[in-house]
């Protein structure tokens, strides 16, 4: 069994640009194709994050989205968080600057184009 979170966007092209071009993640899958995708899977290490638009044939209602993707935060564990901070600090809008946290992580946080929170962290040695 494997958990694969799914987030929704109104602008899939902007999400592709952000996750692939800005963050450097691999797009593992495009649906229905890479020219006009309505859904993508972003590879982050051994995990995937689905990003897509809703489809008319989905029979259940998605909960209304809060302000800027509120309620969702992705934590990405890396070996050297300072290296990732230097790589991304001029490419994304940092909302919580890099620092050691009381719970034993060194981390920084930014928002993706839809307002979902993304944090990179390393354990404090």
Residue map of PLM features:
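Conserved active-site tyrosine of GNAT-family acetyltransferases
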Residues: 15-20, 88, 112-115
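Short, conserved beta-strand/loop elements in beta-sheet-dominated catalytic cores
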Residues: 116-120
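Vicinal oxygen chelate
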Residues: 1-6, 26-76, 85-111, 122-125
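Generic secretory/membrane-interface signal
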Residues: 13, 20, 99-101
């Amino acid at each position: 069994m494997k958990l694969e979170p799914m987030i929704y966007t109104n602008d899939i092209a902007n999400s592709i640009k952000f996750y692939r071009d800005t963050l450097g993640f691999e797009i593992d899958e495009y649906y229905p194709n890479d020219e006009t995708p309505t859904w993508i899977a972003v590879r982050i290490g051994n995990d995937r994050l689905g990003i897509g638009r809703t489809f008319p044939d989905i029979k259940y209602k998605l909960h209304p989205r809060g302000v800027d993707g509120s309620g969702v935060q992705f934590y990405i564990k890396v070996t050297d968080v300072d290296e990732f901070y230097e790589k991304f600090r001029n490419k994304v809008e940092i909302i919580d600057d890099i620092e050691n946290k009381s719970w034993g992580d060194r981390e920084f946080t930014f928002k993706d184009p839809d307002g979902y929170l993304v944090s990179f962290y390393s354990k404090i040695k």
